[in-house]
Amino acid sequence: MGDWSALGKLLDKVQAYSTAGGKVWLSVLFIFRILLLGTAVESAWGDEQSAFRCNTQQPGCENVCYDKSFPISHVRFWVLQIIFVSVPTLLYLAHVFYVMRKEEKLNKKEEELKVAQTDGVNVEMHLKQIEIKKFKYGIEEHGKVKMRGGLLRTYIISILFKSVFEVAFLLIQWYIYGFSLSAVYTCKRDPCPHQVDCFLSRPTEKTIFIIFMLVVSLVSLALNIIELFYVFFKGVKDRVKGKSDPYHATTGPLSPSKDCGSPKYAYFNGCSSPTAPLSPMSPPGYKLVTGDRNNSSCRNYNKQASEQNWANYSAEQNRMGQAGSTISNSHAQPFDFPDDNQNSKKLATGHELQPLAIVDQRPSSRASSRASSRPRPDDLEI
């Protein structure tokens, strides 16, 4: 037999990307098929045709009788069987190499984007797209490849083809020469002058090897079926768990929120620009419409911006209070604002709020003046 080292090295690489059932199947293939075929089986069938004798002296009769009894040698038949059942596994290995090549490209691109991010370039959306692609290809941290998506489908298809090839070769072997060998074969074929008897060398030993290879084929077929069910239920389980995965819900296009695009208010609420011009004061009873607090891009809060907002608001109310105007308390409500580190560094550290002096032009009555001079339990001590 030829050298099996090349095929063995390729199949050995599949071990790292197979399930437990796949690893057992590869072990059976290596030990009980390739190793046994290259050592014991080849020596048993080495003198196959030379030891095939017929009770005639007619030239060419033994050759035609041997060709009729054994259209293909058992050893070559098993070699073809090993090659065919290994091809789907090699195709799956090619898909794994393709995913690993994709991983190298994505990692290289991710490093370039991170370098650009240190220079102040906004690359968050591109980095998010790379993470989604890695999840799609089944790439995890530390170079580990997980069976997911197209890789999982390729693995299932490879198991199906291996099972089909196992069944097909078992049927072909049974159709050609069965699962046992006889000591005597009767042949009546030209150029034999009459019906002749041909004798096979070591039929019992060869029958034992045939039965052994049959059992190994059945074990491999059973492992393929078990692995197929295991991968199927594992895929269903991952699909159910995938609903809670952070990447599972990322199906829409990655685009920034449109709510934060237009600067409408001078205060730093959730959807306003810190550099927007001051808007005129609202009339009494008007409620300031702030941004959507549930927006994921407007959830973070900045302490310094909050203090600056209230300082601006206090200054405006003081000016309006000195002019004799009153402002409804409904205007004083908290604001939402984004967590912008660059803008927060430029803002002041905040000011203490001064109480608003509300001027009332009407003269106070005696009752009200007496009531106002009495201390009340809810009065504040200054």
UniProtKB/Swiss-Prot annotation:
Listed Gene3D superfamilies: Connexin43 (1.20.5.1130), Gap junction channel protein cysteine-rich domain (1.20.1440.80)
InterPro entries membership: Alpha_helix_dom_sf (IPR035091), Connexin (IPR000500), Connexin43 (IPR002261), Connexin43_C (IPR013124), Connexin_C (IPR034634), Connexin_CCC (IPR019570), Connexin_CS (IPR017990), Connexin_N (IPR013092)
SMART domains xref list: CNX, Connexin_CCC
Record gene name: GJA1
Modified positions (Phosphothreonine) in chain numbering: T275, T326
Record PTM Phosphoserine, positions in chain: S5, S255, S257, S262, S306, S314, S325, S328, S330, S344, S365, S368, S369, S373
Keyword Iron: no
Residues modified to Phosphotyrosine: Y247
Positions of region (Disordered): 317-382
Name this protein carries in UniProt: Gap junction alpha-1 protein
Cytoplasmic side, ranges: 2-23, 98-155, 229-382
Transmembrane segments: 24-44, 77-97, 156-176, 208-228
Low complexity: bias regions: 362-374
